[in-house]
């Protein structure tokens, strides 16, 4: 199970997407289940219907049999809300992957925290570069680009480093239409917002 914090942002969602496609390609049984629904700005990541909104009736039966929950981009375990209760109920091991400091790391069985990483998505990228024998898939790269672009303020913040640009170059070289990612997130509005 892959999940991220309530009211998810581009980094959490992009990291989930990046790792999801890798694991699916390895024939692992994997699902993305989040406490909050997918925000409309990120629907372009969901063309394959990979993002699910947690519902105890439809998910708990599957969750009780899994071996690991990977939690992305959460400074606090409780930010995955009711999923915490399910994880504790079934005593499922948890792995935290994040680039923020964690005062309460003991909530997780495993912690992978890199305070120097610009985004959790860049940590997923680093993992995929080592774990894969073949190139990173375009679907994974789309998620990773989303994570890095949003958490660096479109490459404007001080956390933007060489690796961020290397990731962007790899994404461009593999057909990610970076301008469309920007448009989906920042140039579309709901009717109610207009």
Segments from the language model and where they lie:
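Anionic-ligand anchoring segments at beta-strand to alpha-helix junctions in alpha/beta enzyme folds, i.e.
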Residues: 1-65
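Short alpha-helical
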Residues: 37-40, 78, 119, 163
């Amino acid at each position: 199970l892959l999940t991220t914090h309530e009211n998810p942002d581009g980094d959490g969602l992009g990291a989930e997407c990046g790792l999801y496609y890798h694991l699916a390609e390895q024939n692992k049984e994997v699902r993305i289940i989040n406490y909050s629904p997918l925000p409309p700005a990120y629907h372009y990541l969901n063309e394959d219907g990979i993002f699910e909104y947690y519902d105890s009736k439809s998910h708990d039966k599957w969750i009780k049999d899994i071996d690991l929950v990977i939690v992305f981009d959460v400074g606090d375990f409780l930010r995955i809300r009711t999923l915490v209760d399910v994880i504790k109920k079934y005593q499922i091991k948890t792995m935290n992957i994040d680039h923020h400091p964690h005062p309460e790391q003991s909530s997780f069985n495993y912690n992978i925290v890199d305070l120097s990483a610009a985004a959790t998505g860049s940590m997923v990228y680093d993992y995929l570069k080592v774990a894969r024998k073949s190139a990173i898939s375009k679907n994974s790269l789309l998620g990773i680009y989303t994570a890095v672009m949003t958490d660096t303020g479109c490459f404007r913040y001080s956390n933007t480093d060489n690796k961020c640009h290397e990731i962007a170059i790899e994404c461009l070289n593999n057909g990610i239409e970076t301008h469309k990612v920007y448009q989906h997130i920042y140039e579309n509005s709901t009717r109610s917002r207009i």
